[in-house]
Amino acid sequence: MEPAAPDLQPVPEVTKGVPVPTPDSGCCRAAVTTVVAISVASLTLGVLSAFLSAQGVQVEHTAQLHGVRFTSLLQQENSDFYRLLTPALQTLLHFLLRALQPLSLDQEADILQKGIQARLQGQGLSLAAYGTITSVELTGRCEGPVTERDLKSGHCPGNAFSCQNSQCVSKENPECDDRVDCSDGSDEAQCDCGWQPAWRSAGRIVGGAEAAPGEFPWQVSLRENHEHFCGATIIGARWLVSAAHCFNEFQDPAQWAAQAGSVHLSGSEASAVRARVLRIAKHPAYNADTADFDVAVLELARPLPFGRYVQPACLPAATHVFPPRKKCLISGWGYLKEDFLVKPEVLQKATVELLDQNLCSSLYGHSLTDRMVCAGYLDGKVDSCQGDSGGPLVCEEPSGRFFLAGVVSWGIGCAEARRPGVYTRVTRLRDWILEVTSSADTPVVPTEAPAPITPSTPWPTSPESRVPNTTAKPTVAPTPAPLHPSTAAKPQECGARPAMDKPTRIVGGISAVSGEVPWQASLKEGSRHFCGATVVGDRWLLSAAHCFNHTKLEQVQAHLGTVSLLGVGGSPVKLGLRSVALHPRYNPGILDFDVALLELAQPLVFNKYIQPVCLPLAIHKFPVGRKCMISGWGNMQEGNATKPDILQKASVGIIEQKMCGALYNFSLTDRMLCAGFLEGRVDSCQGDSGGPLACEETPGVFYLAGIVSWGIGCAQAKKPGVYARITRLKDWILKAMSSDPSSTAHPHTSSTRLIPSQPPTTTAAGLIPEASTGRPATLRATIRVTTRPLNTTLSARSTTTRRQTPAPGTTVFSHLPDCGLAPPGALTRIVGGSAASLGEWPWQVSLWLRRREHRCGAVLVAERWLLSAAHCFDVYGDPMQWAAFLGTPFLSSTEGQLERVARIYRHPFYNIYTLDYDVALLELAGPVRRSRLVRPICLPGPTRPPEGARCVITGWGSLREGGSMARQLQKAAVRVLSEQTCRRFYPVQISSRMLCAGFPQGGVDSCSGDAGGPLACREPSGQWVLTGVTSWGYGCGRPHFPGVYTRVAAVLGWIGQNIRE
């Protein structure tokens, strides 16, 4: 009998970035193939939970995508679409299937295909726009009768939370979120934990930032014979969690002591306490060779006195989900550099990002187990190191509590690129940890408190092991508060930082330092500050539309470059407004579409005190719980109109939309976003309107998530701040910014556009910053972009001298009579172009990675020097991996010269996110052999090429967008576009180090694989000069998106200072 068609009901909850669970050993493995249109890379899909009621059978499936075939745009891993769309679609998809009997594999494949499509269409995603998935694999399939045991606590299916009364809660991470989900309240029963009274951005441990007293009150220094050896985390009054490998050699508890309540290794603070270790329990399955199950539980001889500086971190439930890309904190006293074996005196802190398990496993040769989790960044620079072992990896949840996600375990080197830190995954070992702590028969009521550390107090020792007194700096220790003999050591709030003053308000926030929020602007009417604004371009600010309900534009000025309302310090700038455009759908009654675009009367000159914030893509996701920064000069207290002289800042968490909608009686629209804390205390207030809600998406790079709009009161409990959601308004913003700036009409929308009676004073265009408002979507290289700094200076040699910077109007290599000479050739078209002949472009170089394949272009500018694009070397920065191929237009030729690259120098101001200063010098191991096939190009003078100049681009890149590489050098003629025209196509990304070339109608362009190649223009003398280096662009040959090139004239000084013959 054919089984009845199943009833497919996609469950509405979607959880981002959840890794695929590992199936039980009894599960079978089967592969099914399906074709699903979707826009995602290496996407992990979730659990199919099938409850077949008629047979009383429970079937679980685990599905994983394979064989993704991308469109050309998504092939660029450094594009905005790839970088932002991919994690946006990393979702756990739930399907509820009902059938009369188990399904066949063919039926499962059909259900899987339909279910995925239904779920993604439900999220409003276009399924056919970006690529095709060619196969899906069922990695697990387990079935059996649903027994009573399966429904008891700890046996809920999938990632469902198990209540003590056996209720299963399917909501992600319901424990300690300040909302009772279990009918017996057990999900909120043990939640004296995780509060963060103050938030500060973290630096690094390797080269890191110092932690403040009380900032990490769960951090412990484990001392082996008085020397700091490992870190540990407080999880209870008498219990610590650390790494098992810390005790490979020293397993006797008598050799160990714990120091808590101090950020100084010396324990010089009066808050420092110490306790002897009574017992060390390593996991029974710990493997010293593989570092699997690398966890240990330590029992202290005396309970710790919880207080302002000593608090436990929260243990997550076994079902707790820490999604990839979540920002978490590490801390420790480990080495600051891999090769600098000196530990810091002060506790170091860092922010790291959780990485996808499959990705990290591939980086480590698939040696990871399910008990491990990776955190860090692919480009390195931020990591734990030796001496940090056993310390905490803690993640803050929307409730404001910190949960222990991992224990510092191992890694290759410290902060190396593509070698993130590996941590013991606490959720997989939580049950064992609780088993150890609950099996102890020692009393939990303290008989005496651990002594505070003072100069006269010896370390606690056993009778068998006496040690001398400590030599801490003398301090006056206050008398500790007495503990009643019958009172257990109880945390005030587990995970709290009572010693840290939480930035309790821009209502009462903390002062920002100069340059900390360089995109913040103050809008003043006369001398009165009335609203904030945010810099998004050299001529553009964003603010709230309601700020201009009753404002005379001619009286408004924007003040920037300083944190002082009085204009003291920094680099203060005061500019008038040329126009204000309110969103055409702005509703002053409900404050929907509450955004305004302000055009400045003059362009800004960017510096370290004035910078734009990045605008997110429309598909950018700011996940619930993400910590973001608000800033402004608004009221410091509700009802108190006193404004601070110094800019205030605070950290707030993104709040789930449905929850916030319920708090505001469902009056929110999709153009609104909530941020703050349910308990209140942190909020924007009157006078902050129009200011930024900025989120740090990658280290040091902030994106504008919202604009301060409205709220009920200021910092009230359960009344968070409401912000205009930028992702929903981005299209209008860009359209408004791309209108003709010389127009005085209403060129872009029907919005209210106010024009002042006085015409603006025109000045020279200002510099564009090193961090712009948007990441270019397509680089011209075929290499993924990550950051790895390289040396940018050369040590002087006794036998050579540096070349002097050329005088204005001269050419660096004008002394080379044959530079820039080439046989005359027809200027045709690289995308849709024609092949170059032998010797036609003798300065063109192909850069080969590992001597296997062409990856980038380069240009010969001297006998042993090449110029290329800096982004070509973001991942592969070792010159030993590169070789230069010259003297032939054929990649498969055996005739050309192959030269080894000795050194790579990227411009010191190169910015990986904006591609500003995207240029690199390559020094060859030896001089090239000049001939009619190999000769350098001339470097230009300092002036810009004239608009409309006809120049040539060459390279072996793709012949069409998404196509294959050319095997013979291609050439194309393009027109140089004016800076104003270029900015109209790319309103916020263009800096003065960039120029555009191509045609408005498209059709002719450089493409992937051409990066680093030349944009060459012919002088009247017949010599060719290097005007630009191929850098980036949107797609290839698209209308209205010309190619963007690094302007060589803008970096002549740097080139001249570094090149020597």
From Swiss-Prot:
Keywords of the record, alphabetical order, are: Cell membrane, Cleavage on pair of basic residues, Disulfide bond, Glycoprotein, Hydrolase, Membrane, Protease, Repeat, Serine protease, Signal-anchor, Transmembrane, Transmembrane helix
Recount the known activity regulation.
Inhibited by serine protease inhibitors PMSF and 4-(2-aminoethyl)benzenesulfonyl fluoride, but not by EDTA.
Q: Which InterPro entries match?
A: LDL_receptor-like_sf, LDrepeatLR_classA_rpt, Peptidase_S1_PA, Peptidase_S1_PA_chymotrypsin, Peptidase_S1A, Tmprss9, Trypsin_dom, TRYPSIN_HIS
Q: Which residues lie on this side of the membrane: Extracellular?
A: 53-1061
In this UniProt entry, which residues are annotated as the site Cleavage?
Answer: 204-205, 505-506, 829-830
Domain named Peptidase S1 is located at: 205-438, 506-738, 830-1060
User: Where are the membrane-spanning stretches?
Assistant: 32-52
Q: In what ranges is there compositional bias, type Pro residues? A: 452-461
Q: Family assignment?
A: Belongs to the peptidase S1 family.
**Reported function:** Serase-1 and serase-2 are serine proteases that hydrolyze the peptides N-t-Boc-Gln-Ala-Arg-AMC and N-t-Boc-Gln-Gly-Arg-AMC. In contrast, N-t-Boc-Ala-Phe-Lys-AMC and N-t-Boc-Ala-Pro-Ala-AMC are not significantly hydrolyzed.
- The protein in question is named Transmembrane protease serine 9
Q: Which organism is it from?
A: Rattus norvegicus
